[in-house]
Amino acid sequence: MSEPGKRQRFSPYKSHRNYRTIRGTDAGLTLRHFDRSRRKYRLFGKLSDDAVAYLLMGISGVICVVLLLCLANCVSGCIHGCTRQDTTSSQTNELDSRVEAQTSQNLTRQFTDVLNYADNITWIAAHAHSYRDERLPELALREQEAAPFVRSILDSSITAPASDISPEQGSMPTCYTWDGLWGSTSYGQGTIATDGSGLVSWYMIRAMLLGDGSQTPVDFAEQAHEYADDTCGTRGEFFTQHAKEAGLSIKEYSVSLDNLKLSCDGDKKLALVCLKEGATSPYQHWAVVARVNKNSTVSLYDPASKKATDATWEQNQLVDKISKLYTVSALS
């Protein structure tokens, strides 16, 4: 402390003092000086520069090999794909060109049936409103085999499939209302295809019991014109009144399981039945029960439904679907 009243004296500035202070020598300290040029951060640790160079060259080589392999694989795939496409395109399925070549014959035929149906039903759907009788497109929807016939009603470029029937006594032919031989013939409120189940059933019965196919459903349509109705399509009186003329004997029975068995027992008698609405189709119609099989099932020949004809029927299952029952045999 300076004495009061006396002017404080300042020593001259000594630059070397400030330097020592900065260096820390005034306080007796010795600072460590880092050489920043020596602080190098190395990616590969203590490896030498030559080792690092060799390592980078190795990695680059591996990457090049991988890229070359990928490129070769892509080129090979493209060549193989083009070759396969050319080979496939040069081959066609002999049975149906719409099905891939080398497909088995059995599978090809199955595809053909479905593809043909798809083609027909698509055409029918596009012209559905043009049909005067809505039951015709309904028939095509319900029965796949009927689609070509239904289409042929409006499409003149299509010929409806027709059966080649050679009636033989003792052999029951399988016939349907939509057959090209008679399906489009006018009958009742529509055609034989929609209303002629009784006429086709009568034809099958005569073919089975008499071996006679001289008269077809077209002929019966003229004979039964007065008997057409909106229930089963044909009234039962047509059969009872024309049986003798046709060389047949017919008798009506009440519907029961016993009477059904009796009506189609053996090869000499057949049962002519009217099936109820909704039994095998949305409408009442006629069908034929041919025989009782060994396993107690019965054979149904339904001219309005291939699905029903192909099915196996238990007797008690079928009898519940019958509204009228006639026994028919050859006139002795």
Give the location of each predicted region.
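N-terminal targeting leaders characterized by basic, low-complexity, disordered sequences
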Residues: 1-47
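Conserved active-site-adjacent core of cysteine acyl-enzyme catalytic domains
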Residues: 2-3, 32-35, 42, 69-107, ...
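Short linear sequence elements within intrinsically disordered, low-complexity coil regions
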Residues: 5, 15-18, 24, 39, ...
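Intrinsically disordered, low-complexity regions
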Residues: 6, 25, 29, 46, ...
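A generic structural signal for solvent-exposed, polar alpha-helical segments
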Residues: 16-19, 25, 129, 155, ...
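Active-site-adjacent structural segments surrounding the nucleophilic cysteine of cysteine proteases
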Residues: 45-47, 51, 55-61, 68-228
